[in-house]
UniProtKB/Swiss-Prot annotation:
The lineage of its organism: Eukaryota, Viridiplantae, Streptophyta, Embryophyta, Tracheophyta. Pfam families: Ycf4 (PF02392). The chain crosses the membrane at residues 22-42, 64-84. Belongs to the Ycf4 family. Its main location: plastid. HAMAP family: Ycf4. It comes from the Eukaryota. This is Photosystem I assembly protein Ycf4. It comes from Piper cenocladum (Ant piper).
């Protein structure tokens, strides 16, 4: 979702609250709970899951391994649910011609650097750069080159833009900021 006028352009960035992250977090949670229940049922010798008798799985070594996989899966799942809850990576890019300032804001992990805020003068922006990596999984990322500070990504590295979409986004950004486009 974008808000745009002649002087101000605000582009909202979607964070970790994507459908794919929800799906993976649910799959990991359910799968790891299943592994953990099978490991516990093999230890207790009872059927906690009625799909198969617990006597078919010995606690040593299969039950221990399944319990370990279940616990590891719960940790990974809790990490995914935490990133979804905190909405890591979300924020906005605000380009303000009137003030001559570009503000980039992102939410990070809780702690000292929870709020990531970068403020740059438009005069310090050298160019908008498109970086293209080919291969089986091509990657196209849009960067803003800033004098003295390096490059700042304007798009997520995991977004799969078509060449036309990334060119359109780069052209809009370069036109609004009045800077050239570079392709690498």
């Amino acid at each position: 979702m974008n808000r745009r006028s002649e002087r101000i352009w605000i582009e909202f960035i979607m964070g970790s609250r994507k459908t794919s992250n929800f799906c993976w977090a649910c799959i990991l949670l359910l799968g790891s709970l299943g592994f953990l229940l099978v490991g516990i049922s093999s230890y207790l010798g009872r059927n906690l899951i009625s799909l198969f008798p617990s006597q078919q799985i010995n606690f040593f070594p299969q039950g221990i391994v399944m319990s370990f996989y279940g616990i590891a899966g719960l940790f990974i799942s809790s990490y995914l649910w935490s990133t979804i809850l905190w909405n890591i990576g979300s924020g906005y890019d605000r380009f303000d011609r009137k003030e001559g300032i570009v503000c980039i804001f992102r939410w990070g992990f809780p702690g000292i650097n929870r709020r990531i805020f970068l403020r740059v003068f438009m005069g310090d922006i050298q160019s908008i750069r498109i970086e293209v990596k080919g291969g089986v999984y091509p990657r196209r990322v849009l960067y803003m080159d800033i004098r003295g500070q390096g490059s700042v990504p304007l798009t997520r590295t995991d977004e799969n833009f078509t060449p036309r979409e990334i060119e359109q986004k780069a052209a809009e950004s370069a036109y609004f900021l009045r800077v050239p486009i570079e392709v690498f």
